[in-house]
Every structure is written in C-alpha cells, then in structure tokens.
C-alpha cells in the first residue's frame, strides 16, 4: 500500500500538474490536492458506515476496486506532457490580466536544469529546510494536539473537533496556494510558513477556546498553502525535466526529518511535563523556513558543462 501511494499520488500528481500548466500552475496543483484532502476527510465517516453495515474486508475490497478502476483510466487517458499530444503548456494562451508576465521566459531557463545539477544548488538545500518547516509542525499537531488540548482543560470531543478543523482548513489553504500564480511562489511559501509558525506558537494559549481555534486555523492554513507552494517553487526554479527526481529526493529527506517531530515533542513532554518547549521549537522552525523561502532567488541558467582538455 505504501509503495502504491508513493508511486501513484503525490509526486506523479505534482509532476503532471506542472507538466501541463504554467501560468495557473499553483492553482491546478492546489485544486488537485484540495480534492485529495476532501477524500481524506471523508475516510472516517465512510469507514464508520462500512463497519456498521458490512465488515472491514468489504471496505478494503472496495478500496482495491476503486484503485484498479482509476489506474486503468489513468493509463488509458492521462498523458505525461502536452507535447506528447501535439499540444503545448497552457495551449499557448497569452498572459491574463493580473497574472505574472515573467513566467514563460523563466520557465524556458528553468527547463534546462537536470536533477543532478539542481540538487547541488543552495536553493535545493534551502528548500529542504522549508520542507521540514511546513511538515513537522503539522505532523506533530496531528499526533499531540488532542492530548495538549485536553491537558489545558478542553473536553475530549472539543479537542478532537479542533484537530478535525485543522485538517479541514488545510484543504482551503491548498487552494490559497494559488497565490503563487500572482506573486513570486517563494514569497507565497514564506507567508505560509509565517502563518503556520504563528499557529504553532498560538498553541501555548490554547486554554482559551477562541485562541485555540485561531491557532489550529493558522496551522491548517499555513500548512495547506506551503504544501502547494513547495512543489511550485521547485518547478519555478528547476523546470520540468528535473522536477520528479528532485521532488522525490526532497520528499524522502524531509519525510524522514519531519517524521521526527512527533517523537521529539513526546520526548520533550516526558522530560518537562509540558509542550511549551516543543511548540516554541516548532514556531522557530517554521519561521526559519519562512526566512529561507524569502531569501531564495531563481537560480538562473544551469552551469555550462565543463569541457575536458
């Protein structure tokens, strides 16, 4: 299952979105993953319905059947690039009012990069920091937020509801990641990480119901925006040819590092009896990532190959 998810969802969907679209690249990727978020949000009620009326085996058979149908449809209908069908990105539509008019020239430069060249750049290293900065706080909140909220006095049902609210708001954040079509995508990422950091710090004030809601909303919104902005920045910097490999490498590294967040937060809580240190640390990690995003600039043309004597 994990291998199938890795091969068939995040990296391929991001790759196809940026292969086919340029001027509305962020919006397209945002819509794709917003629908993924909606499906994820529906899993729990559908799961409960299946268990109430059937049994768990029926649920898994249904998932397998849907997966096979979608795999066949994708194989029959989806094409990797518009050029494979005699088309071009965006259908060669001229820029619309309000969009960025520097996208196409930069894309022509970015498409010259190879993955081997891209992973050696400072921009790639900074994007690894940004990847950890947006995913570690959200992963940690999902794992520990219910316990923290009950510790500060909220009923268990309220705590669970706030965690669900955070996930739901992240869906809207993914659509808001479309801001990267109108402004520099690295600035959209910087704003997203700043918001997520505010939310992580705001969890220190979560004893108040209103402030708890604001905090989880900021985390969800910032995470959703960053989730879309990161692949858009990669496409903006390194183009189509290098995208899938650099994204796979980035997600592997940041997945391991960000996965340590819940574990480290648990260690901090066991040592101190409080989540204060963990939430302050996550806030600083977010803001460090935001600073990295704001500092990044387009890498320009790739280095010319060296000529051996």
Regions found by a protein language model. Name each.
Residues 35-84:
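Helix-loop-helix hairpin linking two adjacent transmembrane segments in secondary transporters
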Residues 5-21, 225-238:
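Intracellular juxtamembrane helix-capping segments at the cytosolic ends
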Residues 173-184, 269-270:
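Helix-to-loop junctions at the C-terminal end of transmembrane segments
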Residues 40, 237-272:
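A late C-terminal transmembrane helix in Major Facilitator Superfamily
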Residues 195-207:
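C-terminal ends and interior cores of transmembrane alpha-helices
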Residues 116-176, 261:
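Extracytoplasmic gate region of multi-pass secondary transporters
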Residues 65-102, 292-297:
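C-terminal membrane-cytosol helix-exit motif in multi-pass small-molecule transporters
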Residues 1-8, 132, 211-225:
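Hydrophobic core of transmembrane alpha-helices in multi-pass small-molecule transporters
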